[in-house]
Amino acid sequence: MSKENKMTQTKDKIKCIPAHVIAQRKVCFREAASIIKMAHDNGCKAVMISGSSSANTDSILSIINLRITVGTSVVIDVEGYEEENVNNTIRDIFKLLTTPED
């Protein structure tokens, strides 16, 4: 492969197996902002699904509109370019949702 081809070649996105979590805390603006930051810091995009609604990490309001409260079932689907980043994002969001509110 030529040097030019190596430079223009793009990596395939890594998509995780969706993770399922039962929320142990209510997701308000602070938590939604944290979820968006976690995904962006790891170079990933996440989609959260609750019931028939979904939200992505491009919109804080879409996450708020999921109305996640204690006991809400949430599916987290993350994709990114590096497996480690995808795993970190899933772990961080999962931890945030399963840590009870103070």
Specify the residue positions occupied by each region the protein language model found.
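C-terminal structural segments of small proteins and small subunits
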Residues: T72-D102
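Short, conserved, surface-exposed binding loops centered on an aromatic residue
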Residues: Q9-K11, M38
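Generic detector of bulky aromatic hydrophobic side chains
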Residues: I17-A19, A39, S53, I93-L97
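N-terminal leader/presequence segments that are low-structure
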Residues: S2-T8
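Amphipathic alpha-helical interaction surfaces in cytosolic regulatory modules
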Residues: R25-V47, S53-T72, V86-T89
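Short glycine-/aliphatic-rich beta-strand segments at the starts of folded cytosolic domains
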Residues: K13-A23
